[in-house]
């Protein structure tokens, strides 16, 4: 999901997305530990998705506007 799409979401939607993505990361790490993960790059993708959501939430806290 792109940052532009995230910025169009409400705070409630972003927090839900963050919780869902963290849960997905937990499941991927568990699969990795048990040797069942097919694509290890999925962990990196999910971590970046979490970072994007957190960045948008923090921007809103600080009142940063984007054109």
From Swiss-Prot:
It comes from the Bacteria. Keywords: Ribonucleoprotein, Ribosomal protein. One of its GO terms (biological process) is translation. SUPFAM superfamilies: Ribosomal protein L29 (L29p). One of its GO terms (molecular function) is structural constituent of ribosome. Belongs to the universal ribosomal protein uL29 family. NCBIfam families: L29 (TIGR00012). This is Large ribosomal subunit protein uL29. It comes from Desulforudis audaxviator (strain MP104C). The gene is rpmC.
